[in-house]
Amino acid sequence: MLAGRDFLSNLDMTSAELRAVMDTAHSMKAGEWRAVKPLSGLSLALVFEKASLRTRTTFDVGMYQLGGHAITLSNTEIGLGTRERVSDVARNLERWVDGVMGRVYLQQTLVELAQHARIPVINGLSDMLHPAQLLADYQTIEEEFGQDLRGKRVVYIGDGNNLANSHIHMGILTGTDVTVVTPVGYEPNAGVLMDAVKAGVEVHLTNDLDAIQGADVLYTDVWISMGQEAEADIRRRAFRGYQVTPEMLETISPDGIFLHCLPAHYGEETVPEATEHPKSRVFDQAENRLHAQKALLYHVLGDMKPRW
């Protein structure tokens, strides 16, 4: 299974492995693991190039609840690729801790960490992908629609960014029908789209807002990600009209739900009335970061024993 392996992309799992993680996440949320400490004596380094609320809190609390320990390292302390080579950071951390979670600017940084560390590396966010977030997203979706999600319409509206890319990967694994609604020039990564082609999975790309109608899941994310501030005005103009509002939520399936990974830039990709709408599951989704990532940590680190 996933024991001892890197998790840089949702496609680092098989569908069966994803099912095992999801089942564990649901049982953890139900309180069935409250007295179990499978990661006792293990440590996880949390490496941050980007600011974080949900990623830092949930991985830290998750390790604690499973009996392990997390240590947070900011980029001002480490200087990935500046103060020290990424490979040297990896070869140091592997001597002290049992795994690394990285929330970084570039996917290549995680690839380098994984290449040089003999311990598992987990993607907590990169410019390319956000796979840990998608575990929480799909836990939330399963809470609404059950385990068999084949044919459910997941419509992502906004920037074809790391979230859109990871939604495509999850569509490959789960059989959801993924549509990305985005302005011309802001489509998902070409390599990720090729992953779908190779898997024989059709991804629907459009700039037609009518594609939202009847969606089972409507998902959005910020128009301006960290590091894109210089493009803010251009992006706001490009995405005008792509804002999720309560009126838009009335056009999705009657049983449909609205998700946003947060933080929300209110007045841009959505408004407070949407995240507070009866169809919103945004804060359930945020809670599930804890349960889904605990499940991931258990499956990746759970077979390890303390070295000292």
Swiss-Prot record:
One GO term (biological process): L-arginine biosynthetic process
Pathway: Amino-acid biosynthesis; L-arginine biosynthesis; L-arginine from L-ornithine and carbamoyl phosphate: step 1/3
Record-listed L-ornithine binding positions: 162, 221, 225-226
Role summary: Reversibly catalyzes the transfer of the carbamoyl group from carbamoyl phosphate (CP) to the N(epsilon) atom of ornithine (ORN) to produce L-citrulline.
UniProt-annotated binding residues for carbamoyl phosphate: 103, 130-133, 261-262, 289
Family: Belongs to the aspartate/ornithine carbamoyltransferase superfamily. OTCase family.
UniProt xrefs under PANTHER family: ORNITHINE CARBAMOYLTRANSFERASE, MITOCHONDRIAL, ORNITHINE TRANSCARBAMYLASE, MITOCHONDRIAL
Protein name as it appears in the record: Ornithine carbamoyltransferase
Source organism, top-level taxon: Bacteria
Top-level class of the enzyme under EC nomenclature: transferase
GO molecular function: amino acid binding; ornithine carbamoyltransferase activity
Protein biosynthesis among keywords: no
SUPFAM superfamilies named in the record: Aspartate/ornithine carbamoyltransferase
UniProt main location, coarse: cytoplasm
Organismal lineage: Bacteria, Thermotogati, Deinococcota, Deinococci, Deinococcales
Subcellular locations according to the entry: Cytoplasm
InterPro entries: Asp/Orn_carbamoyltranf_P-bd, Asp/Orn_carbamoylTrfase, Asp/Orn_carbamoylTrfase_sf, Asp_carbamoyltransf_Asp/Orn-bd, Orn/put_carbamltrans, OTCase_ArgI
GO cellular component: cytoplasm
Gene name as annotated: argF
